From Swiss-Prot:
This is 2-phospho-L-lactate guanylyltransferase. Guanylyltransferase that catalyzes the activation of (2S)-2-phospholactate (2-PL) as (2S)-lactyl-2-diphospho-5'-guanosine, via the condensation of 2-PL with GTP. It is involved in the biosynthesis of coenzyme F420, a hydride carrier cofactor. Pathway: Cofactor biosynthesis; coenzyme F420 biosynthesis. Keywords: GTP-binding, Nucleotide-binding, Nucleotidyltransferase, Transferase. Coiled coil: none annotated. It catalyses: (2S)-2-phospholactate + GTP + H(+) = (2S)-lactyl-2-diphospho-5'-guanosine + diphosphate. GO terms for biological process: F420-0 metabolic process.
Length: 227
């Protein structure tokens, strides 16, 4: 089994965070998220595919992962390329921005894989934040948009044994300043939270019935979020 992590080029990373974090800070945020994900994947064979040489070097040297230089633009094309290049048939696909994933989640997936052909963990926005395939060509890869529903439909259409792994922690992907608040609430002992704290980012409760919190940085930037 291989665990595949596709990673976008650094210069295109997390643009929705650009008003809150500099380009260098967004890069370091990504690297720390990868550290957290890699920690959850301890003992498994990890493959990182990217067009970015710095990401590939980081994956190879620090994470001790296998790396693939992406040839084509687009997430689905990158995954298909990786499928062609890796020999293993059984795969797990994980995005690079879910730092709250834990080793226990992976242990759950491995146990479930004995009984299911496809396991899908949805994101909060209808995407796919973990996809297990007993055989990498079982379904057509359809990331982007509401990919959770697309992958679920593919599994149903082919009469495959599928399981929806519904985990809040896996569902949290980091794309906006509001998302950073979830790291402070749920991400104790993560590289990602420690990095964000080092930048002076804080999260404060608004103590309202709606359960709102505020993400702020040094008193300058402030973002409210209804939970």
């Amino acid at each position: 089994m291989k665990v595949l992590i596709p990673v976008s080029p650094i210069n295109s990373l997390k643009t929705r965070l650009s008003e809150f974090l500099s380009s260098e800070e967004r890069k370091n945020l990504l690297l720390n998220m990868l550290r957290d994900i890699n920690k959850a994947l301890e003992g498994l064979d990890v493959v990182i595919i990217s067009r970015d040489e710095e990401i590939l070097e980081f994956g190879k040297n620090e994470l001790k992962a296998e790396t693939i230089k992406e040839k084509y633009k687009g997430l689905n094309k990158a995954i298909k390329q990786a499928f062609e290049e890796i020999e293993d048939d059984e795969v797990i696909i994980i995005p690079a921005d879910i730092p709250l994933i834990k080793k226990r989640h992976i242990e759950d997936i491995l146990k479930l894989s004995k009984d299911y052909d496809v396991i899908i963990a949805p994101s909060r926005g209808g995407g796919t934040n973990l996809l297990y395939l007993k055989s990498k060509n079982l379904i057509e890869i359809k990331y982007e948009g509401f990919s959770f529903l697309k992958h679920l439909e593919e599994a149903k259409k082919k009469n495959l044994r599928y399981y929806i792994y519904d985990s809040f922690l896996i569902s949290v992907d980091i794309n906006t300043p509001e998302d950073l608040g979830e790291i402070f609430i749920h991400g104790d002992s993560t590289y990602t939270k420690n990095y964000l704290k080092g930048l002076g980012i804080e999260v404060e409760s608004k103590h309202s019935s709606a359960g709102r919190f505020v993400v702020k940085r040094g008193g300058d930037n402030e973002v409210s979020n209804p939970m």
